[in-house]
Amino acid sequence: MNRGLVYFHFDPHHQVRDYVLAALSSLRPHADHVLLVSNSPIGDADRARLETCCDEILQRPNEGLDVGAYRAGLEHLGWERLADFDELILTNHTYYAPLHPWEEVLTRAAGWEGISFWGMTEHAAMRPHPFLARRELPRHLQSHWIAVRHRLLADPAFREYWERMPAVSSYRDSIQWHESRFTGHFAELGHTWQVAFPVDRYRSANPAIEEAPALLVDGCPLLKRRALFHDPLHQDRQAVVGGELLEAAVEAGYSEDLILSDVVHTATARDLIVNAGLTEVVTGCVPGAVGAGVQTSSPAQRSSGCVVVHIPAGREAVERAEADGLARRLASLPAHWRVVVTSPEPLDAADLERVTGRRPTQEDTEEDSAHGEGDVSLRVVRDLDPRGTIAFLTQCDDLWDPGRGAGGDEGGDDGGDGDALVLRITVGPEPGPKTRADDVAHRQALDCLLDSPGYTAGLIDLFAQHPGLGVAVPAAGHIGQAHAGPTWDGLAGAAKALSRRLGLTVELDPLAPVAPSGAMFMARPAALRTLSEGAKELVRLTEQAAVGPEQSAERLKRARAAEVLELLTVYAAMSSGFHPREVLTAAWAGRLYGALAYKHRVVTADLPDHTDEQVRFLQARFGPRAGVGARVRTYVDVHHPDMGSALKPAYRYLTGGASDLARAATSAGRRLRDVGRPRGEDKGD
């Protein structure tokens, strides 16, 4: 069979991700001609990689989304040449593959004689249409894989379909004018079709997103990327269990790193953690032994590590460290890990031992003491914030990331047995007034990082098991804490501004950031480098604008710069290609779940049944767009769903028409306003 393949590619950051190469390389043996059409720029290095599995690469402007790319690819091949193919596959970058051999589905499809086209998956009919003023979204093949046979390629109607395609400028346009239209359009012209994995086998309208594990069990070779960054509330409504999809992909033999190193650039942190099941209840194990749970190598054979403990100025900070049992907790770490204490003021040997449980030498108590394996050392840093975050990123990176200074790609001196790790621990006081809830949150964070030798060994092994894991943060607590509105604490604007300044490629969570509680976490040094460089630039610019060190420190404190950097810790790691995980002990998992389940039941007792309905119900009454119309819509949807479904097409038609009229009136008004205006007059006056 003479088979061609047109692969649409787009990446907002102008990268060709490894999963794209994996998919194309696996398809190369099954296609006589591979054309990649990219709506985003391709660098020389990526082009060289693509040339190993593509015959042609067509780069074009980002116009028309996938529809524009397919049309450009067909025109590039030539309409007359299309008839030379027995089959032409139109496919794209929206999936990971192969999770099963292509041969299985291609061999099965080869037996479908007499058809004009076939698809990999399909979407069921939906009534009413989910977003248009129509009664129904028709059943249709999904556009991420449509294989067109010679019979349709040679039909002039195929060319006419593409050349008369309406302008496509949005995801909904693509669904309306191509994906949901292609199947029915050509079926009405007498062409027959097949689907490899019919929707009738499954219990949802969109199994590619809502039942992806079931598709994999049935042998589907591809996994839709959207399943990992789709709205978690939608997935919850469809009973999609976060984590099962990633587990199913790994069980099928696909690389977890290929998936997570890509999706971190698309999903927000919270969506990714929920959809991929990245909240870990760490199982303890015996260090240096193989237990029933996590298998652990000898501590002497582990990658090297460094723990940086920040002690604020004042005697009460040392006393707080003792009250936290910090010395006992630090004993949970492998003995060869280095312990570095940072503080704005010198600490004597007795204080260092009280805090760390390790006996320092006279040299270790100097303001910038040398350090070797297994010792405790002191570094006196500038007092720029209560938790020493800025100092950790700007004055201590040579301690936790020695590889960067040597020009290495990865930090540490691990002898090739994995990256070095850094553990960051802070001691109160926290910014602002203290409450019992703050004490609980601080204790929970310490437990989730330094609960016991077995637990901490399991946490270290988590990084060995997942090479793409960049930062592990204590799971978010909620006991005794307020949950009023977005939890960026007034720093959302500053976080967005600094994110742009740092060149972060990920989208910040709109409501609640994924941030390390108490600025405590375990991480790979490489995952912190972007944040460290950004903090250094921030300090440098502040010092240039200030009269002296005291004024620059005051400006950083007034701008809450350290808090913003803490909020961006996870997002900076994701922008570097690392994924985050939330970690907690089994004891805290039980405590938090029990309290949260009770809160959920009490809060939702008088709300609609499902969480997505509850959110819409509350937003209609208390959200930024609350109003009578929103209340009526949610009331009808909840109490009279059949009536709501019947009225939606008419409602969309009327509101859509009103919007069109409003836009037309505005445009006409502007034209009338300009009548008689002298040429060259400023229209902004």
Each language-model region and where it sits:
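ER/Golgi luminal nucleotide-sugar-dependent glycosyltransferases, focusing on the catalytic module
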Residues: 1-408, 416-685
